Amino acid sequence: MAAAAAALSGAGTPPAGGGAGGGGAGGGGSPPGGWAVARLEGREFEYLMKKRSVTIGRNSSQGSVDVSMGHSSFISRRHLEIFTPPGGGGHGGAAPELPPAQPRPDAGGDFYLRCLGKNGVFVDGVFQRRGAPPLQLPRVCTFRFPSTNIKITFTALSSEKREKQEASESPVKAVQPHISPLTINIPDTMAHLISPLPSPTGTISAANSCPSSPRGAGSSGYKVGRVMPSDLNLMADNSQPENEKEASGGDSPKDDSKPPYSYAQLIVQAITMAPDKQLTLNGIYTHITKNYPYYRTADKGWQNSIRHNLSLNRYFIKVPRSQEEPGKGSFWRIDPASESKLIEQAFRKRRPRGVPCFRTPLGPLSSRSAPASPNHAGVLSAHSSGAQTPESLSREGSPAPLEPEPGAAQPKLAVIQEARFAQSAPGSPLSSQPVLITVQRQLPQAIKPVTYTVATPVTTSTSQPPVVQTVHVVHQIPAVSVTSVAGLAPANTYTVSGQAVVTPAAVLAPPKAEAQENGDHREVKVKVEPIPAIGHATLGTASRIIQTAQTTPVQTVTIVQQAPLGQHQLPIKTVTQNGTHVASVPTAVHGQVNNAAASPLHMLATHASASASLPTKRHNGDQPEQPELKRIKTEDGEGIVIALSVDTPPAAVREKGVQN
């Protein structure tokens, strides 16, 4: 490598060492003190060409090559040959070491490439097959072996000196130094090449293509018809005329990438380019492999697809060969009724799969309609389901107040007409969660809402995100209503209007006693707030904390119940204690938490069926024996008693405190 670097730095002059140099260059034959006429650069090697012919391939037991490219099976043993033709003119510097039959390597002649490998080679993206005529190489070009990423950069070192020498002898050089000695024939009329000025927002794109910028795709001056003055000097360097490009199919790829055409389009292209507008199956294969290098090295399965398209597509007609025509196999033609349409779409490129041209601004979960109002409780919306959509994020406002002002109109709650499970799509946050479908209708004046939140325990250890739901319980206010809630309820239970509700993690706020219009009834509003983590140290001193696990996802359930007046009237028998009439209400749930009670439908059924009268006990012995008052015991010995007031003056109602 050091020898190659030294030879590279002294290119054009006799190097100090005589090595041809380069990792991967395994051939000799380079005379000491010779001139380097070309350079081959790879990823891990550099080779200086000092003789007339150089072979590139891979070493084997059958022989070695000048430049070895490793052991890839896609590279033949003798894959490429780079040579200079004999009889090139020189510009000085003799090489007496070379035999007289060989031209001087520093003669500065043109370089040619001959492909010897069966897989061919790409020269600047143009495929060169085996057996093709030698290709004249430009001063700098790149070779790439098919089906690999192995590349070689070829650089001619002597051509620069020849151009400088010819340029100094040219008379044009002294007159206009900035013009190269090239003859450019500019026609008098350029109207067919000049297009009108583009509009400020005009786009130039092919059919069914997606422009990548607002200004449009296609900035090539020759393809879109615009010719700038600075582009005139580039026309002389265009080695292939425009008409030749159109004849050979200018849209065909020059590399081995898969063309963006269907098999039917490839068949139409092949048939329309035939002289008599008909081809045999073998002729279609030949046309495709000639114009699209991808199908030369690809699997032969594409040929089966071509045959299937010909036999199944109604636009292709099979024409038998006449007896006078030599050869075998039938011809294929295009249906004349659809020929013009098929030819028009033959070169229309397909859009890549999975890349839509225009994306909708809304995702699959979003909806054009506005989400449900927060005031309409019980209606499942994007806000309560946990799924965030662009619509819900853009229209998210301040939440509705839980306790509206006295002057504000109370919203009408929905009444459940049917309850069923709505299964959402798999993978969504709402999958396998019960959803209550509600229908809105007018409610009587006697129904008053009691709103609270229930935090259900975690029954599984899955990593699903928590689903938040809202609990709304609508009770009919009977003649006897709750007037006080005192003490500490047991873990996972508390009682509202004689019904026990499961709550593993909640703080019971002090009840609010609100007088009704007649002054005889009171209503309690119990608000339960979830606590994410509660330690045992705080349980000893707190008097209104219910213990549960540290992490509990909050779920909400909508429970709405309507009953006519008098259905839930509780037959309360007064109890005389110190001259005060007190009715005690036992709890309906004791012991451990029942996981089934956390289900919304189960809770709905339990709540609807718990309409039996609540028993009470009279301290005098003349009445039939009733179940005793049951107090809920907690770990620290505290209990809770919920007292109900009878239709007596408010002064006769007192609150029963904590029982130890």
Curated annotation (Swiss-Prot):
The modification N-acetylalanine is found at residue 2. It comes from Homo sapiens. Residues 258-353 bind DNA. It comes from the Eukaryota. Keywords: Acetylation, Activator, Cytoplasm, DNA-binding, Isopeptide bond, Magnesium, Metal-binding, Methylation, Nucleus, Phosphoprotein, Repressor, Transcription, Transcription regulation, Ubl conjugation, Ubl conjugation pathway. Changing residue 328 to A: Decreases DNA-binding to 25%. GO terms for molecular function: DNA-binding transcription activator activity, RNA polymerase II-specific; DNA-binding transcription factor activity; DNA-binding transcription factor activity, RNA polymerase II-specific; DNA-binding transcription repressor activity, RNA polymerase II-specific; magnesium ion binding; RNA polymerase II cis-regulatory region sequence-specific DNA binding; sequence-specific DNA binding; transcription cis-regulatory region binding. Changing residue 527 to R: Abolished SUMOylation. Residues 129-171 are annotated as: Required for interaction with DVL2 and SUDS3. The C-terminal part of the DNA-binding domain may contribute to DNA recognition specificity. There is a cross-link at residues 161, 164, 527, 633 (Glycyl lysine isopeptide (Lys-Gly) (interchain with G-Cter in SUMO2)). Residues 203-212, 382-392 have a biased composition (Polar residues). It is found in: Nucleus; Cytoplasm. The modification Phosphoserine is found at residues 30, 239, 373, 398, 424, 428, 599. Residues 15-32 have a biased composition (Gly residues). Residues 54-128 form the FHA domain. GO terms for biological process: canonical glycolysis; intracellular glucose homeostasis; negative regulation of autophagy; negative regulation of DNA-templated transcription; positive regulation of DNA-templated transcription; positive regulation of transcription by RNA polymerase II; regulation of DNA-templated transcription; regulation of glucose metabolic process. Residues 1-36, 85-104, 203-260, 359-407, 610-632 are annotated as: Disordered. This is Forkhead box protein K2.
